[in-house]
């Protein structure tokens, strides 16, 4: 994920320019803007100028979806996950999309913007919910395939819910890792048990700056280790080992005992998370296959392609990948190895992220959160192609093979492998806007 483009959404010019101007020097802007009149004015102007929906789509599968957070222990060495899973009870509240004020602060610090912007973001998006039932009990009696999900640069565990919810609605348990490598906009841990009991969080924010290749590679190695660690912890829960969720939420973690199909484990990630998919597959053979969503290839090692025997699927946006990225991807195509690649026509890098649903058409396209393709159509293609791939290479007894043609790019809104346009990027892979 390229933070400058992602967070441009939250610049004041996107919506404050549309309301009646006032002189910020003569008042406290936060107090002023918190009046109900101004809240309604800003929100209504945002909706009027967006001309589109602002909700994250529900899952289309046969299962209801639950959601909870899990933390395996204390210190920043623990695993921190958002879990999406098939649920047996809908009589629970929907989960909060962005769960803490500090995440808004992290987004603004990633941008290098003022703290006021974070308060404004919280005002506008702090109460947004996702269509997954918070702490709803797991639907027991089945063994579910497991997906570990890795977020992009400047993101965090909860903002890929459109993907997590859709997969869970089709019978997967999805564990979205929140990385502690200073690539998340924000994350936290508890130093010890007293800190957890008192709610004293220790926060880690995005490491701002033009990081060199070696630092990105260090982060990538850590991310891969965190994905493997999350898998090991979930498998130990499945085995019935005594574990505790230090978040102490109203979710019985023992429900997960015996719930995983341990032979059917995959990894999915977007942008830096796509690079993490590649890194993790090269180090951990427990993952049977992987899906790299518009991967940020800059930190990927030159020889890692030779270390991945598992099937690998690249699903790209139309214009994010540079010519150098495509050359790196081509190296993964080797004899006797299962590789597939498609791109979603008219899509941009952030069509894979929930933020594509957080604003309507005009503002979304202006700020590169939406492409020319409808966001729901793009997400539907991404999810269906992923499901078809997962069925084929995890050996699932489902009906996802009805979408096998999507893996080959056989759709008017898809581009088959190696006919995908490339774009100009900076040396660190930051997306740049292409001329139409």
Swiss-Prot record:
Catalytic activities: a 1-O-alkyl-2-acetyl-sn-glycero-3-phosphocholine + H2O = a 1-O-alkyl-sn-glycero-3-phosphocholine + acetate + H(+); 1-O-decyl-2-acetyl-sn-glycero-3-phosphocholine + H2O = 1-O-decyl-sn-glycero-3-phosphocholine + acetate + H(+); 1-O-dodecyl-2-acetyl-sn-glycero-3-phosphocholine + H2O = 1-O-dodecyl-sn-glycero-3-phosphocholine + acetate + H(+); 1-O-tetradecyl-2-acetyl-sn-glycero-3-phosphocholine + H2O = 1-O-tetradecyl-sn-glycero-3-phosphocholine + acetate + H(+)
Sorted UniProt keywords: Glycoprotein, HDL, Hydrolase, Lipid degradation, Lipid metabolism, Phospholipid degradation, Phospholipid metabolism, Secreted, Signal
Entry-listed glycosylation sites: 76, 200, 324
Gene3D superfamilies (UniProt xref): alpha/beta hydrolase (3.40.50.1820)
EC numbers for this chain: 3.1.1.47
InterPro entries: AB_hydrolase_fold, PAF_acetylhydro_eukaryote
Expressed in which tissues: Plasma.
Main location: secreted
Disulfide bonds: none
Role: Lipoprotein-associated calcium-independent phospholipase A2 involved in phospholipid catabolism during inflammatory and oxidative stress response. At the lipid-aqueous interface, hydrolyzes the ester bond of fatty acyl group attached at sn-2 position of phospholipids (phospholipase A2 activity). Specifically targets phospholipids with a short-chain fatty acyl group at sn-2 position. Can hydrolyze phospholipids with long fatty acyl chains, only if they carry oxidized functional groups.
UniProt protein name: Platelet-activating factor acetylhydrolase
Organism, scientific name: Cavia porcellus (Guinea pig)
